[in-house]
């Protein structure tokens, strides 16, 4: 019997399993299957004719070989995001980086000439971004976002304390500049209209800060703050465990995405780097 495969564009609710009984009225002389990628890791439905009576069987055991393997895919979607992000680093920033340095902030931090004023602009714009990101998560009932409340990676309150410390030292705290404002508005739009892209920024903002961001903070502090350790670079609890907890949650969320949605998320990485790079550049202003 000939087999016809249909890949519908609609999405079935992630929280509800398909009911075979609802399809008992179908009549067909062929075999219809929904691609596994729609609701991975679940199977798909098979509908076939049987002596003039339509019947439905759950073909959970039937799997389809993926046509393309993505780097890191076997370890979970977070590893896919990490792989893409590392490739976007410069060769000076990471061993896996593929880009050449084109501006001072893309080169070795040891060669930077930061200023306190520029660093304050960086901290203020960073706080606006974290305020926005964490406000979206805290105020959302959308399951994809709600699971990331109180992860321990939040930075807005730590930045508030740091800016208060600078104020006590006699520094004037500036207003947010264009890089932070633009990124903040962009995140708000993504949160409403593009959850996969929003999750990409969520991952890159927090994970980049926990690694390269922490290293930058240490070296900049040594140059201009007499080794003062800011709250921005401190976490309550073991950072590695906090990150692992979030990795697990991200992987779980991505299990319900189609391959197309995962690829869309990965494609957003370059924009995340662009926005973050513009804010980082403020340190040298």
From Swiss-Prot:
Instruction: Please list the residues that bind heme b.
Output: 89
Please verify whether the record's keywords include Transcription: no
Gene inactivation effect: No visible phenotype under normal growth conditions.
Q: Which reaction does it catalyse?
A: heme b + 3 reduced [NADPH--hemoprotein reductase] + 3 O2 = biliverdin IXalpha + CO + Fe(2+) + 3 oxidized [NADPH--hemoprotein reductase] + 3 H2O + H(+)
* Renumbered residue ranges of the record's region Disordered: 89-109
What's the record's pH-dependence note?
Answer: Optimum pH is 7.0.
Compositionally biased residues, Basic and acidic residues: 89-105
Q: What CDD domains does the entry give?
A: HemeO
Which is an annotated GO molecular function term of this record? metal ion binding
What the entry lists under InterPro entries is as follows: Haem_Oase, Haem_Oase-like, Haem_Oase-like_multi-hlx, Haem_Oase_decyc_pln
The EC number(s) this enzyme carries = 1.14.14.18
Keywords of the record: Chloroplast, Heme, Iron, Metal-binding, Oxidoreductase, Photosynthesis, Plastid, Transit peptide
Where in the cell does this protein reside?
Answer: Plastid, Chloroplast
Name the enzyme's class: oxidoreductase
An example GO CC term for this entry is:
chloroplast
Instruction: Provide the transit peptide span.
Output: 1-58
Recorded family membership? Belongs to the heme oxygenase family.
Purpose of the protein: Catalyzes the opening of the heme ring to form the open-chain tetrapyrrole biliverdin IX with the release of iron and carbon monoxide (CO). Produces specifically the biliverdin IX-alpha isomer. Plays a minor role in phytochrome assembly and photomorphogenesis.
Query: What is the name attached to this protein's record?
Result: Heme oxygenase 3, chloroplastic
């Amino acid at each position: 019997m000939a087999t016809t495969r249909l890949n519908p564009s609609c999405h079935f609710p992630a929280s509800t399993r398909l009911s075979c009984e609802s399809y008992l009225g179908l009549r067909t002389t062929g075999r219809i299957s929904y691609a596994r990628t729609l609701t991975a890791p679940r199977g798909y439905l098979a509908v076939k004719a049987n002596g003039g009576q339509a019947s439905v069987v759950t073909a959970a055991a039937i799997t389809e070989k993926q046509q393309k393997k993505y780097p890191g895919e076997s370890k979970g979607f977070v590893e896919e995001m990490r792989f893409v992000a590392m490739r976007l680093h410069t060769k000076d920033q990471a061993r896996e980086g593929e880009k050449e340095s084109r501006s001072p902030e893309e080169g070795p931090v040891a060669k930077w000439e930061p200023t306190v004023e520029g660093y304050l602009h960086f901290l203020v714009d960073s706080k606006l971004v974290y305020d926005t990101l964490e406000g979206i998560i805290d105020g959302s009932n959308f399951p994809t976002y709600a699971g990331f409340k109180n992860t321990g990676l939040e930075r807005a309150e730590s930045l508030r304390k740091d800016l208060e410390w600078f104020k006590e030292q006699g520094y004037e705290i500036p207003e947010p500049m264009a890089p932070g404002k633009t990124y903040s508005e962009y995140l708000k739009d993504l949160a409403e209209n593009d959850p996969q892209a929003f999750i990409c920024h969520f991952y890159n903002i927090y994970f980049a800060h926990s690694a390269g961001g922490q290293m930058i903070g240490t070296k900049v502090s040594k140059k201009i703050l007499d080794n003062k350790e800011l709250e921005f670079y401190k976490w309550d609890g073991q950072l590695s465990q906090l990150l692992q907890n979030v990795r697990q949650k991200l992987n779980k969320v991505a299990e319900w995405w189609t391959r197309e949605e995962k690829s869309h998320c990965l494609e957003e990485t370059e924009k995340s780097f662009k926005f973050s790079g513009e804010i980082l550049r403020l340190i040298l202003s």
